[in-house]
A protein has these predicted regions:
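A conserved short beta-strand within the histidine kinase catalytic ATPase domain
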Residues: 42-49
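N-terminal assembly/transducer modules of large multi-domain enzymes
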Residues: 2-7, 37, 124-190
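Flexible ATP-lid and adjacent glycine-rich G1/G2 motifs of the Bergerat
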Residues: 63-126
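Structural motif
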Residues: 43, 55, 103-105, 112, ...
């Protein structure tokens, strides 16, 4: 007697085990930079506060996130056809941020999503609500707040400065622009 089998996924276990695929604890920083660039941003701005409780805020002036569900859907990037064809995004970059922080709040395009990491890992429903008007600067379309990240300020700035070296858009850390000596626009003008 024969039988058949099909590939299947144990979704909760997959989500929890994904943290082991992000072996570098600073990967989420370059992933968030890449998302800002893909969204058409002209800058990505990082602000870090070790005191309250190791909080990192990431802001950009790109197109924003049209559907916040895409942030928490594995293998669904939400990028338009042009980005999909040119860069083949995996739809997993934001998951690296999920594993980097204890709590995350996202403000984008007038909407707000706020959750604890464990809520997301347990696949509990997370409310999307209207974002308060004063929740972000006027030059920002997306603001991501990461609370309780397990990095020091020195580790964060080192990773951001390394990633910024050849990055296509301006990168700021705590109000100061990071050097981009290998960025295309700098190479063309030097």
């Amino acid at each position: 007697m024969s039988s058949t089998v099909t590939p299947q996924i144990h979704s909760q276990r997959l989500i929890k085990n994904l943290m082991f695929s992000f072996t570098n604890k600073t990967t989420f920083l370059s992933e968030l930079m890449q998302n800002a660039r893909r969204a058409g941003a002209t800058f990505v701005r990082f602000s870090f506060d070790e005191v309250w409780p190791n909080t990192l805020v990431v802001e950009d002036d790109g197109a924003g996130i049209a559907n916040l569900q895409n942030l928490l859907t594995i293998a669904e990037s939400g990028w338009d056809e042009t980005i999909q064809a040119q860069e083949n995004p995996f739809g997993m970059g934001f998951m690296s941020a999920l594993f980097a922080a204890q709590r995350i709040t996202v403000h984008s395009n007038g909407k707000r999503l706020s959750f604890d990491r464990e809520e997301a890992l347990e696949q509990k429903p997370i409310i999307v609500e209207d974002s308060p008007k004063d929740s972000q600067s006027t030059d920002v379309s997306t603001r991501i707040e990461l609370y309780g990240i397990g990095l020091t300020q020195a580790e964060v700035i080192s990773a951001i400065e390394t990633a910024a070296q050849g990055f296509a858009i301006k990168v700021f850390f705590n109000g100061k622009e990071c050097g981009r000596p290998f960025a295309w626009d700098n190479l063309m003008h030097n």
